[in-house]
């Protein structure tokens, strides 16, 4: 596994006592007693005013948290004291506001959901490639470059000449591999994601499928943007992030995008001028896919968020992680209904 990484603030980020540190972290490690860690970890986060969501599973830990630097340091130190959780890979960036409204520690079957049994990055994984060596690798004409992220993430930025698998969720990635990649034809495959975790599992999956030369970007896109100068970059656009910032630019500053809470796709200011855009309810991509029941529920949630903002309060309905979970549950419910027909 890669060692812990502390993402330095850019010159444009002036840190003060009120600056919020955003920390993305993960580690694949066997956690036999992960259920017992849930309550003490949640209590520790709450005690130091750290918000966000952490996922615990038998295969490890994953998530993004935010709060004062002292709080983040306290949580990381607490995790480091737990069996197997020392040297957690983490990256830090900074914001003037906390992008999360709640503190959550959830128990899961997987810390990143592929839905394939037996894939263990601790046993087999692709070759890590440092950000400084990434450009040379993906410039090799024999290398097939695959973006393992979801379609709404790729919409606003990707590496030059990368393949978009057109997946809505990471669960669809194995099916993409089965239909589009051939171990006898594609001798070199390179993959990347936001912070590195999906690539740990996707490269492990390809190795299990018999692909020999499999590479992935160590530390993900965020580490690449931190270390590779914009004058040398092969990254095009902005990088989607799973918090209230929606996206960051090459300087790791908050980008120019908002997000449709209905379909999760990023939106520009111009796109928000569409007649189909209703804040918190729909946009030009999904207006004809949102049911009346959903439209009514989304509108009420947005009304509650607006009322909370007027009172100077935060509302959990505006938390990106909460919205993602809501959409995922809706999809699962829909699939369950179709399966029962």
From Swiss-Prot:
GO MF entries: oxidoreductase activity, acting on paired donors, with incorporation or reduction of molecular oxygen
Purpose of the protein: Catalyzes oxygen-dependent 5-hydroxyuridine (ho5U) modification at position 34 in tRNAs.
SUPFAM superfamilies for this protein: Rhodanese/Cell cycle control phosphatase
Family under the similarity heading: Belongs to the TrhO family.
Bias type Basic and acidic residues, positions: 306-316, 324-341
Gene Ontology BP, a term: tRNA modification
Class in the EC hierarchy, top level: oxidoreductase
Name this polypeptide is given: tRNA uridine(34) hydroxylase
Keywords: Oxidoreductase, tRNA processing
Active site per UniProt: 193
Top-level taxon in the UniProt lineage: Bacteria
Provenance organism: Colwellia psychrerythraea (strain 34H / ATCC BAA-681) (Vibrio psychroerythus)
A Pfam family matched in the record: Rhodanese
Oxidoreductase as UniProt keyword: yes
Positions of region (Disordered): 306-341
EC number assigned by the record: 1.14.-.-
HAMAP family with a match to the protein in the record: TrhO (MF_00469)
Chain ranges of the Rhodanese domain: 139-233
Reaction catalysis annotation: uridine(34) in tRNA + AH2 + O2 = 5-hydroxyuridine(34) in tRNA + A + H2O
Biological classification of the source: Bacteria, Pseudomonadati, Pseudomonadota, Gammaproteobacteria, Alteromonadales
């Amino acid at each position: 596994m890669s060692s812990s990484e502390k993402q330095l603030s850019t010159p444009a980020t002036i840190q003060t006592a009120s600056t919020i540190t955003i920390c993305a972290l993960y580690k694949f490690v066997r956690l036999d007693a992960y259920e017992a860690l849930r309550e003490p970890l949640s209590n520790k986060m709450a005690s130091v005013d750290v918000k966000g969501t952490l996922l615990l599973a038998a295969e490890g830990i994953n998530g993004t948290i935010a709060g004062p630097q002292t709080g983040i340091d306290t949580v990381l130190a607490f995790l480091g004291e737990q069996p197997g959780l020392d040297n957690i890979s983490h990256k830090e960036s900074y914001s003037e506001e906390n992008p999360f409204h709640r503190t959550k520690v959830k128990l899961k079957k997987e810390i990143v959901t592929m839905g394939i049994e037996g894939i263990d990055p601790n046993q087999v994984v692709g070759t890590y490639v440092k950000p400084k060596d990434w450009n040379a690798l993906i410039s090799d004409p024999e290398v097939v470059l695959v973006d393992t992220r979801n379609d709404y993430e790729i919409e606003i930025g990707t590496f030059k000449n990368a393949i978009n698998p057109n997946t809505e969720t990471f669960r669809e990635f194995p099916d993409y591999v089965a239909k589009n990649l051939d171990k006898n034809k594609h001798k070199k495959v390179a993959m990347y994601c936001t912070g590195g975790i999906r690539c740990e599992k996707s490269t492990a999956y390809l190795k299990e499928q018999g692909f020999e030369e499999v590479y992935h970007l160590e530390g993900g896109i965020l580490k690449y943007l931190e270390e590779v100068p914009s004058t040398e970059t092969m990254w095009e656009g902005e990088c989607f992030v799973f918090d209230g910032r929606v996206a960051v630019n090459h300087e790791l500053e908050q980008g120019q995008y908002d997000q449709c809470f209905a379909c999760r796709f990023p939106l520009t200011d111009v796109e928000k001028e569409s007649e189909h855009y209703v804040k918190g309810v729909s946009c030009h991509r999904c207006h004809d896919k949102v049911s009346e029941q959903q439209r009514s529920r989304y509108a009420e949630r947005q009304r509650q968020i607006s009322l909370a903002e007027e009172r100077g309060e935060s509302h959990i309905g505006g938390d990106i992680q909460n919205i993602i979970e809501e959409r995922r549950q809706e999809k699962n419910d829909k699939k369950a209904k179709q399966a029962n027909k």
